[in-house]
């Protein structure tokens, strides 16, 4: 057997729709004899094939070719052992019919599967199944397929549906039929309803699996060796269940509950095969390794004891205790207390903690700590401290919290005391102070690597407290006795390097807590010292700013960077302010000297910009010499310059050159005045438009001394000044009020606006304009009259053409046109107010009527009457009458569209022949038919209640309404039939008439 791939699926034509029927497919094998014994025609027809032989001379002879009606695929060269269904589904797996038949014999295939339902739905071919688009029926293709039916029509029943599982055929479907219920009611034992999966488990197995919490998929997998749990003995035998890989991973990932204080010997005894491990590391259980797979890297889990929620202990205390060795002088009592806290796992109250700490630590002990101990630097311990002190390591979180608190308190107090208090103050402190710096301060002060002085205790012979910042030499720290600045070298000599114990004890913190009250009192005094007004600070730091050499020497000696505090910054700002004031005073004095002594001859206006520039240079140079920023100083002296420099006025002498005059005008925010033809305009120099327009300058007028600068601006249109306004001067009153300068007053006095010559010229121009406008108006009126006359002529000629062409079609109307033109010309020569009538048209029309041959009497009579009425009623209107108004009555003339059309111009030729009549005199008298009456429903005659028949009286209301509707419908049908018969008769008459023509 060989298949033929179809090029494309053919459409469902009529022949293909017939092949849906099994009997039709079987008939194709009988019409043309099937050449083979096997496979039989019956089997081929059931599979969906119909006989389609190919016997053409050009191609091969395929006498055993068959084609599927559903997928249109052809097969030929059949053999005896071929199975048609198997060949069909193998070579055309997408065929719905083959898929349905193959699934019928498969017990593992669910009949109600979605794929089978879709294939069954495709068998109900459109335009073949009669209930496709019938909403009143419940037999749509999707519903039939979901009920288990396929379409299998027969010769007797075209709506037959067939079930392949129970071989039932149902046809003659009604609107109320439900296919699913009908199928189940007739064949309840059909496989479509009773199918069960043979591979499914029984209910007892499912219930067992649900109670045992085992996945059904896990039972099908092979058993594997599971890791032994550490709590159970390895000698015992356990039942092993095979879990899925995900469950294996979850089991291996479970944390094992192990105690921190377990005995390692017991573990070794219980697990002899495993390598010995440390007690802190857990025992790792791994699954057996599979072949050809690399082992995954698993991180060992670290198990920690469970701690109370409200404990002050840190998570890493175990690591610290294990890694850091204890010092020699630690007692066993502290270890017992610490172990007790870990084992009992109960948080201690605050009172209990204080009691234990007082019991452990003696009150007379004192501890010296350094930052080098915190950062990891080893220091030599004092033997006396080791012998006296005996305590355990407190929890780390308590140490850090207390250290941070004390650092914040000490750093604040020491910063305030170092900025205000002097070194010479004597305070008798019997106790030593702790000074520990934060990591941020350590980063700033790490430059001196030789000393490693990140934080230390400072002890003098007199036991005076010194600042906790040894590396920073602040400028405000001065010696009270000498009044000079303490250099870093001298300060370095005072530092005492002491040996401290490696660990900070609670004694230090107890001493610090006792001293808080005294330090807070000192802090309040320091804050009051900080609230000193600025004038006192000026006096305080005046000596520091004057002694430059001392500052330089002190900074050169110290290799460490100078740290500037807030008070030092305020001192620098005060010094800047004083320098600027001194410089400004000096510059003012220099300006006065220059203006009085050197430049007495020159005017003041020339000297102002030069002195301002010099003053700026002096101030900038003075600030740069100090080595300070010029940004702040510029903002200060700019305002002072603006104050003492006088703004230039408009009254400037002619001696100034052009460049200086422009500079002065740009700097000063003054009003520039431009006087053009006696019209004043004000402008602001700061606007960008005025700056662009101010470039065009008349140097001649500037030298003449009338104005400062005559700027020609074309921004605003200049108002036209009438001569009467010039005389009265009212145009000046209408302008906006402003202060007029002396120069402007001079210009108004010297201007020639109010001179008698200019007034006479303006009067002459006004008279000339009046004469010109009057001439133009006269010309316009004359042109308007001529246009009106021409339009009237055109309309008259159109009327003549239409009327006379209908009356006398054989002659041209030239005389009438010329006569009308002559008449209109004579009218145009006369005055426009007179009204004239055209009398020559009467003569022309009378002559033409007498000589008209072969014209109808009706048309000639109509033309006479119309021409007389039209000509006598024409009155030429006056020239000043608008053209939009009609000058004759259009309703009288039947030729309104012709008169107003643009096709009949005065010189266009007119038809000479008369049009033939559309209908001859012998035409049959057609009756007018109104077809709209057929569409209207007939109105029944009102029935009187007295004339009701006996039948109607016996009826109910509903029956009587139905009876009346039927009666009206019958009458309407009769009326329609009568009209149809009449139309048919008239149609026959029309046909006979046309044939006779």
From Swiss-Prot:
Protein's name according to its UniProt entry: Chromosomal passenger complex protein bir1
Feature: compositional bias, Low complexity: 408-423
Family matches, as PROSITE patterns: BIR_REPEAT_2
Composition-biased stretches (Basic residues): 288-299
Residue stretches of each BIR repeat: 25-99, 120-194
Gene Ontology biological process terms in this record: cell division; mitotic sister chromatid biorientation; mitotic sister chromatid segregation; regulation of cell cycle; regulation of mitotic cytokinesis; signaling
Sequence ranges of Basic and acidic residues compositional bias: 426-451, 773-782
Oligomer and partners: Component of the CPC complex at least composed of ark1, bir1 and pic1. Interacts with the mitotic checkpoint complex (MCC) subunit mad3.
GO cellular component: chromatin; chromosome passenger complex; cytoplasm; kinetochore; meiotic spindle midzone; mitotic spindle; mitotic spindle midzone; nucleus
Mod. after translation: Phosphorylated by ark1.
Organism: Schizosaccharomyces pombe (strain 972 / ATCC 24843) (Fission yeast)
Compositional bias per record (Acidic residues), positions renumbered to this chain: 311-320
Role noted for this protein: Component of the chromosomal passenger complex (CPC), a complex that acts as a key regulator of chromosome segregation and cytokinesis. Has a role in chromosome segregation by recruiting condensin and ark1 kinase to appropriate sites as the cell progresses through mitosis. Ark1 activity depends upon bir1 function and phosphorylation. Ark1 with bir1 function is required for full-scale association with kinetochores and formation of a complex with mad3.
Transmembrane portions of the chain: none
Segments of skewed composition (Polar residues): 240-252, 370-392, 463-476, 485-512, 756-772, 817-830
GO molecular function: metal ion binding
Keyword field: Cell cycle, Cell division, Centromere, Chromosome, Cytoplasm, Cytoskeleton, Metal-binding, Mitosis, Nucleus, Phosphoprotein, Repeat, Zinc
Domain of life of the source: Eukaryota
InterPro entries: Baculoviral_IAP (IPR051190), BIR_rpt (IPR001370)
Main location group: nucleus
Binding sites annotated in the UniProt record for Zn(2+): 163, 166, 183, 190
Annotated region (Disordered), positions in chain: 217-329, 370-527, 682-701, 755-782, 817-838
